[in-house]
């Protein structure tokens, strides 16, 4: 590729609405341009990287036995009504009517369509296992699109769907996809972790997320540095921090805590550790035609509620936070001084695992400006229902028993689910088993955010000059920067020869023949993030040398002119083989 025949749309300044590094650099490097909120044009530089991501994803999906197809972006509402997600999905699902007043959606995902294909095409157990995948544009009407391609409304995604006759087959399909994802993200040159996760709106029983590790990541990941344990903080099991409950050592006592509505303030006033205070959270579940059920969830003062865990408890799937009016009605006091002792009306109490093992703790007195100290289970309160309802913290014991938890930030770029029969039962996707009886197909779902990978890769690989692409997804692997290409026959002939040698070696090279000043050339290609650069100048050529600098190198080095192409080609091949 010659730069004079290519579009390079670099900018010196980032747009005012760009909040994170990847958004700023993708705009400045001429990769994307905004069309509307969360919707982007992908310019030639950006599209080259997208195509490289797609190629790696496609190769590994094919290697794992995936079969590519293409489903429509527009889907009829009837399919979503069959699955039940027409009502469940919410405003993120973009709905519209055609001229005949039929309801349609722009697909954010394709479980319904692929299940429709399967129920019409797969009739026998002999046709399974099968795994269909596509690489296609999706749309989710995010309430607040931001961060460029990281949280856009329109995006490119690879989604795959497996169909099996039994649980053993589903487990094998899941393992193949998990292994394929490990290969994909390894080949992309990214530091990543696979973490146990919640299945979210997709549904299902078992899932893992693949996260690119980055300080700017939206998701908190709990992991153990001394073992293989890793989980999204929403899904990580929180073990009790107290192995055995101590015997009571204090009498229960009502204490004045004027104006101290927070656990931290109460602990400071009473000169006790925060870990001895209790955070009381009031939830409600609605009952048709009757008053709501009120739940008091008790956490240690330094812990945070995990709503996803709560929603999986019996009776709490559709919980909400209680209103202040409800809190006053059941507890006789506004929030800030709530507790399980002496409630105005009966409530259901759930204690976190750690709280259940505490002694001599402090709770709200259900009276403004008062708390109760020295509270103990069994003596002052009945034994509670116990559940894991909190987020893990750094320093907690690892659930696998092999160390302690640490927390890092990650950007989700892939997700694998075991859906089971969620969609096949809802939509009647059955097959005839070995005995001729109809059975629901067992499904798996496997997604990779193609365009999101670009943003995540940049968040992990950049400096003050611009992007630092891994070789596998760089728009170009090497750039040739000739000094005076249009003025020096020696420079032009050498640059053209190097270009031909690199092309012949299968290297993705661009020759900058625009006639720009060296500073402009270097700034453009450092901003765009090309991993390798060769500078061809008359002075060096007279000594038989060409200047080489890797994008991560602090200094340039000199290479023999006749070996420069082979040397750089070998560096690129070695990087791609890692």
UniProtKB/Swiss-Prot annotation:
GO terms for cellular component: cytosol. It is found in: Cytoplasm. One of its GO terms (biological process) is prolyl-tRNA aminoacylation. It is an enzyme of class 6 (ligase). Keywords: Aminoacyl-tRNA synthetase, ATP-binding, Cytoplasm, Ligase, Nucleotide-binding, Protein biosynthesis. It catalyses: tRNA(Pro) + L-proline + ATP = L-prolyl-tRNA(Pro) + AMP + diphosphate. Pfam families: HGTP_anticodon, tRNA-synt_2b, tRNA_edit. One of its GO terms (molecular function) is ATP binding. Catalyzes the attachment of proline to tRNA(Pro) in a two-step reaction: proline is first activated by ATP to form Pro-AMP and then transferred to the acceptor end of tRNA(Pro). As ProRS can inadvertently accommodate and process non-cognate amino acids such as alanine and cysteine, to avoid such errors it has two additional distinct editing activities against alanine. One activity is designated as 'pretransfer' editing and involves the tRNA(Pro)-independent hydrolysis of activated Ala-AMP. Belongs to the class-II aminoacyl-tRNA synthetase family. ProS type 1 subfamily. PANTHER family: MITOCHONDRIAL RIBOSOME PROTEIN L39/PROLYL-TRNA LIGASE FAMILY MEMBER, PROLINE--TRNA LIGASE. NCBIfam families: PRK09194.1 (NF006625), proS_fam_II (TIGR00409). Consists of three domains: the N-terminal catalytic domain, the editing domain and the C-terminal anticodon-binding domain. This is Proline--tRNA ligase. It comes from Burkholderia lata (strain ATCC 17760 / DSM 23089 / LMG 22485 / NCIMB 9086 / R18194 / 383).
């Amino acid at each position: 590729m010659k730069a004079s025949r290519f579009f390079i749309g670099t900018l010196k300044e980032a747009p005012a609405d760009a909040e994170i590094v990847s958004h700023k650099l993708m705009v400045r490097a001429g990769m994307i341009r905004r069309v509307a909120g969360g919707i982007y044009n992908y310019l030639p530089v950006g599209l080259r990287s997208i195509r490289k991501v797609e190629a790696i994803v496609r190769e590994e999906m094919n290697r794992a036995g995936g079969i590519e197809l293409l489903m429509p972006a527009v889907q009829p509402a009837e399919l979503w009504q069959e699955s039940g997600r027409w009502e469940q999905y919410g405003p993120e699902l973009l709905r519209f009517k055609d001229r005949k007043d039929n309801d349609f959606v722009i697909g954010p995902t394709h479980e319904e369509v692929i299940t429709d294909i399967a129920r019409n095409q797969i009739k026998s157990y002999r046709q399974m296992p099968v795994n269909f995948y596509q690489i296609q544009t999706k749309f989710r009407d995010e309430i607040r699109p931001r961060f460029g391609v990281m949280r856009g409304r329109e995006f490119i995604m690879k989604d795959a769907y497996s169909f099996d006759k039994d649980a053993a087959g589903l487990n094998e399909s899941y393992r193949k996809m998990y292994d394929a994802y490990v290969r994909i993200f390894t080949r992309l040159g990214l530091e990543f972790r696979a973490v146990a996760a919640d299945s979210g709106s997709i549904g299902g029983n078992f899932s893992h997320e693949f996260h690119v590790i980055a300080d700017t990541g939206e998701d908190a990941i709990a992991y153990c540095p001394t073992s293989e344990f890793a989980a999204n903080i929403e899904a990580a099991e929180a073990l009790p921090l107290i192995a055995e409950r101590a015997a009571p050592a204090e009498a229960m006592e009502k204490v004045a805590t004027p104006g101290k509505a927070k656990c931290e303030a109460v602990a400071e006033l009473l000169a006790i550790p925060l870990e001895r205070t209790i955070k009381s959270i009031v939830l409600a579940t609605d009952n048709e035609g009757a008053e709501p059920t009120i739940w008091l969830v008790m956490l240690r003062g330094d812990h945070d509620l995990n709503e996803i865990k709560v929603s999986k408890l019996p009776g709490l799937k559709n919980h909400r936070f209680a209103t202040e009016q409800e809190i006053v009605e059941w507890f006789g006091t506004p929030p800030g001084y709530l507790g399980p002792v002496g409630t105005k009306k009966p409530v259901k109490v759930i204690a976190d695992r750690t709280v259940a093992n505490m002694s001599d703790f402090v709770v709200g007195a259900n009276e403004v400006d008062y708390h109760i100290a020295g509270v103990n289970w069994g003596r002052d309160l009945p034994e509670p229902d116990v559940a894991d309802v909190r987020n893990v913290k750094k320093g907690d014991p690892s659930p696998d028993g092999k160390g302690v938890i640490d927390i890092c930030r990650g950007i989700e770029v892939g997700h694998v689910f075991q859906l089971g029969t969620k969609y096949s039962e809802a939509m009647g996707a059955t097959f005839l088993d070995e005995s001729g009886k109809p059975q629901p197909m067992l499904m798996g779902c496997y997604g990779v955010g193609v365009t999101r990978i670009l943003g995540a890769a940049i968040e992990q690989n950049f400096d003050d000059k611009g992007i630092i692409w891994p070789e596998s997804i760089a728009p170009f692997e090497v750039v040739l920067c000739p000094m005076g290409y249009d003025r020096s026959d020696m420079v032009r002939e050498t640059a053209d020869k190097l270009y031909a040698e690199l092309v012949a070696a299968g290297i993705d090279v661009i020759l900058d023949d625009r006639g720009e000043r060296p500073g402009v050339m270097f700034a453009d290609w450092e901003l765009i993030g090309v991993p390798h650069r060769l500078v061809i100048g008359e002075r060096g050529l007279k000594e038989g040398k060409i200047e080489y600098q890797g994008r991560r190198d602090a200094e340039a080095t000199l290479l023999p002119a006749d070996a420069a192409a082979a040397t750089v080609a070998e560096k690129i091949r070695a990087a791609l083989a890692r």
